[in-house]
Regions:
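C-terminal helix-rich "cap/oligomerization" subdomain common to oxidoreductases
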Residues: 1-2, 70-73, 338-340, 347, ...
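Beta-loop-alpha module in the N-terminal Rossmann-like domain of NAD(P)-dependent dehydrogenases
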Residues: 20, 39, 50-113
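Hydrophobic residues in well-ordered beta-strands that form the structural core
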Residues: 95-96, 121-123, 152, 295
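Contiguous beta-strand/loop segments that form the cofactor/metal-binding neighborhood of enzyme cores
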Residues: 175, 199-306, 346-358, 376-379, ...
């Protein structure tokens, strides 16, 4: 639904909310009209911090505010679908954080309701809006590495920036602990994977020039040894946000695309699953016919070329290697060389605002968000069943089945 100015009501004041609010406030075509949270005191605190006039502790009441034409949903995953449907029925445009939904049926219901209501629906897939990742895609699009054929993703230890917004809150805090609860975060026993894999798969398709993933094979390993063997216990001395799943660890995921020449792998080696990788956070290598790109993502640190820190390195077959840095002030949450919370969310929300004021579809729609949930479900099904899983064969019933 096209609007001349985006007037936002944001619901859910957890870790990512401040990044969204700052992005709206920095844009000339947007205004944050109100914020909403069950914790009324927190809502008042955030409203005072950012100069927001209205606060609500009831989502339905906020939807009745005629000044609001757009709703930004940054609540825990189990609330996404119901809130999105209510917002669509109230005639509000919607930006819903990832993961889009807990089940395929409810995600499809949201897409259908938004279409019926004639409102715009975007899913908040911020990884594909990181400056470093977008630069990698631009280099691929201009043919710098030839046809991209393989994605290699590394997932190392993430370190929070001491004193960063919200990081003083314990992991069990209401605003953070939901990500470890499969009833609220999803994952059928793998809540961390469900919350994050949508990012990894979205990036894997984006850097393969939007080629769709066809099937997924995930390796599950038992984590009993982490508790039994003191010499190999995971390092919990740093301010890590997450821990291995109680259902087991998924350290490796592989996938193929519709194009049989293309494939990908994600590998997790960090302190929380008892491993060491000198590369921090998320990073990606894209291997093409005539070159390769190495690029940092969320929480990324440790990439270098010729003794200098780099955010992206472009290797050309038989040609010059080139490195890039993006001077965006680092990250407000992670001890990272690249800006995720600050810049990626600003880029994403800029795309959303632009789509609304132009009356066009945003770059990442509800259909895209639903597809990445399906891909993540395929990975979890594969880990539980021990077999490769085709996306076309994933159903809510299969995903929810006990291993």
């Amino acid at each position: 639904m096209k609007v001349s100015k985006v007037r936002v009501g944001l619901v859910g004041l957890g870790l990512v909310a401040a990044s969204h609010i700052r992005a709206y406030l920095a844009h000339p075509d947007a205004e944050v009209v109100a914020i909403c949270d069950l914790d009324a005191a927190r809502a008042e605190e955030i409203a005072e911090q950012f100069g927001i006039a209205k606060t609500y502790s009831d989502f339905d009441e906020m939807l009745g505010d005629g000044e609001i034409n757009t709703v930004d949903i940054t609540t825990p995953t189990f609330l996404h679908a119901a809130m999105s449907i209510k917002a669509a029925r109230a005639g509000k445009n919607i930006l819903c954080e990832k993961p889009f939904c807990l089940a395929l049926a409810e995600g499809q219901a949201v897409c259908d309701e938004a279409a019926r209501a004639g409102v715009t629906l975007m899913v908040g897939e911020s990884y594909v809006f990181m400056s470093s990742i977008m630069k990698a895609r631009a280099l691929i699009d201009t043919g710098e590495i030839g046809k991209p054929q393989q994605i290699r993703q590394r997932f190392g230890t993430w370190l929070e920036r001491p004193g960063a917004h919200d990081t003083e809150r314990a992991i069990t805090d209401t605003h953070r602990g939901w990500r470890l609860d499969t009833s609220r975060a999803g994952g059928a026993g793998f809540p961390w994977m469900f919350d994050h894999c949508v990012h990894f798969f979205a990036t894997a398709e984006y850097l393969m020039r939007d080629a769709r993933i066809k099937d997924v094979y995930a390796l599950k390993s038992d984590i009993g040894w982490m508790h039994e063997d003191r010499d190999h216990a995971p390092d919990t001395s740093e301010t890590h946000m997450y821990r291995p799943e109680t259902a087991g660890d998924i350290p490796i995921i592989t996938w193929t695309y519709d194009d049989p020449a293309c494939q990908g792998v994600w590998m997790r080696a960090e302190a929380l699953n008892g491993k060491y990788d000198p590369m921090f956070g998320f990073s990606v290598s894209v291997i093409g016919e005539t070159g390769m790109i190495e690029v940092l993502g969320e929480g990324g640190r440790g990439l270098a070329w010729q003794g200098r820190d780099a955010h992206l390195v472009l290797h050309r077959k038989g040609g010059e290697t080139q490195s890039f840095c993006f001077d965006e002030g680092g990250d407000e949450i992670w001890q990272s060389d690249v800006s995720y919370y600050s810049r990626a969310h600003k880029n994403q929300i800029g795309e959303f605002i632009g789509a609304l004021t132009r009356g066009t579809l945003p770059r990442y729609t509800g259909t895209d968000g639903l597809h990445q949930v399906r891909t993540t479900m395929a990975a979890i099904c594969s880990a539980k069943e021990g077999v490769p899983v085709r996306l076309a064969d994933v159903t809510d019933a299969r995903y929810s089945r006990e291993a």
